[in-house]
Amino acid sequence: MNTTKEKQMIKHVEGTRYGRFYDIGDGIYVPSVTTVTRYGCPTPNYLLKYIVNNSKGDYDKYLETNSEALRVGTAVHDNCEKLLLGEDLLIENDPEVQKGVISFCKWYQDYLPKVIAIEEVLYCKNHKRGKLIHPFAGRCDLVAEMNDETWMIDLKTSKSLEDYTYVIQLSMYKMLWDARHPERPIDRLALVHCKKNFMGAQPTARTKLFKEVKFDEKSVKSAVRFFYRYQEAFDSKGNLKTKAKLQTEFKL
């Protein structure tokens, strides 16, 4: 778990037009895990097709849809965290959020995980040859023990769990966790589907709410390498570091 000093040090997250950056102390800024996967991984064709079809080519409509999905996802995550911390909840008149939490509760009751950490901010300041070993940071949803094994679990409200960036995100969290907690490394990785669009009052028995994924360090390194190659042209605020000096005075 993060200490009070660590929470004070890493609570500042700088937002830029190119994602979020964590201040992990000593003047070091690193991109968030989701920022790396967003800009360091290609967008799958099926997702591009969904974006275009759903927005009908209207960028403002896409932003509206994306904002609502983000609101629902954030609300589901926040409420699941409260439940794990022992709070009782009352959620009314918000069907997608209610269904997302219902799905989470069903998974929890089926698997009965023993909570180890909730929403822990993960980062690593270890260097090798003058460079950070893991030049990224992030907040993992849940680390829990199940069947005498340590699982790292990410909650997702998206319609599908097939996006491979989810595997890369969990792999990045595992790398950070293992660096910070060598006494208890992560054994297995999984996604919990907080499904928000099922029919009826409860997910059916056939609804798959839990998906194990395999650690993929090679893909992490590729995403990080591409991200930093892309980011080299920008400063920490997302502005171009160098701009061409254009002629200002003209005469024939």
Short names for language-model regions:
Residues M1-A75, L252:
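Charged, glycine-rich intrinsically disordered N-terminal tails and low-complexity linkers that flank
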Residues K7-H12, E64-M152, L161-T165, R180, ...:
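Catalytic cores of nuclease domains that cleave nucleic-acid phosphodiester backbones
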Residues R38-G40, S160-D163:
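A short local loop/turn or secondary-structure capping micro-motif enriched for an aromatic residue
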Residues L122, K159, K196-F198:
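Residue-level detector of flexible, active-site-proximal loop/helix-junction positions
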Residues L155-K156:
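Activation of the activation-loop gatekeeper triad in protein kinase-fold domains
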Residues I168-N197:
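Catalytic cores of nucleic-acid endonucleases
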Residues F198-T207:
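Acidic Ser/Thr/Pro-rich low-complexity disordered segments
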